[in-house]
């Protein structure tokens, strides 16, 4: 008996919900009605989701098969930043996308290959730079020391010349006032 009461409660609740949402509920169409509502809810959900791409009608080209477009496909294109939709121009005609799928795919492949080459080059270079960087650093330090020593030698020479020049000039000045 309790099982029948539960079913009655479910049926009465379903009737109440149907009347609340403005649907006519009939027991013989219960399954068909539910399936129709489920399909309607799915399509409504797809169209109600926001998407930054403009939703424009697509004209299938002769070499392509007609394709079912859903909002989920457009959302995927938004996330992957693929601009593979036709643009509607001012004169009323459709323009082909700037990049076709083949071109964008080849660009991605080229980019990934160049990135891998750079990565390999950097890893090889960084592995070889360990001892070389120390060697270069030592060479730079030696060069600095040489430059400093040369400057000191030049300063000493210039100071000696100045002392010599003053020494030679001093007797002339001493003789001049006499």
UniProtKB/Swiss-Prot annotation:
Sequence ranges of Basic residues compositional bias: 34-47
Top-level taxon: Eukaryota
InterPro entries associated with the record: LNP1
Keywords from the UniProt entry: Chromosomal rearrangement
Ranges of compositional bias, category Basic and acidic residues: 147-167
A Pfam family it matches: LNP1
Region described as Disordered: 28-55, 89-108, 147-178
Keyword Cell cycle applies: no
PANTHER family referenced in this protein's UniProt entry, alphabetically: LEUKEMIA NUP98 FUSION PARTNER 1
Clinical condition linked: A chromosomal aberration involving LNP1 is found in a form of T-cell acute lymphoblastic leukemia (T-ALL). Translocation t(3;11)(q12.2;p15.4) with NUP98.
Protein name, as recorded: Leukemia NUP98 fusion partner 1
Higher taxonomy: Eukaryota, Metazoa, Chordata, Craniata, Vertebrata
Gene: LNP1
């Amino acid at each position: 008996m309790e099982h029948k009461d539960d079913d009655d409660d479910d049926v009465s609740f379903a009737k109440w919900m149907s009347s609340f949402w403005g649907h006519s509920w009939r027991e013989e169409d219960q399954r068909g009605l539910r399936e129709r509502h489920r399909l309607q809810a799915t399509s409504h959900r797809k169209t109600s989701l926001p998407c930054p791409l403009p939703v424009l009608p697509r004209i299938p080209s002769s070499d392509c098969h007609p394709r079912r477009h859903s909002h989920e496909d457009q959302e995927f294109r938004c996330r992957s930043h693929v601009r593979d939709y036709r643009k509607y121009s001012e004169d009323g005609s459709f323009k082909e996308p700037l990049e076709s799928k083949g071109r964008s795919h080849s660009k991605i492949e080229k980019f990934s290959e160049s990135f891998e080459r750079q990565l390999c080059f950097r890893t090889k270079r960084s592995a070889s730079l360990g001892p070389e960087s120390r060697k270069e650093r030592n060479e730079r330090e030696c060069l600095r020391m040489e430059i400093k020593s040369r400057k000191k030698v030049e300063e000493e020479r210039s100071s000696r010349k100045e002392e010599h020049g003053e020494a030679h000039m001093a007797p002339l000045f001493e003789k001049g006032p006499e």
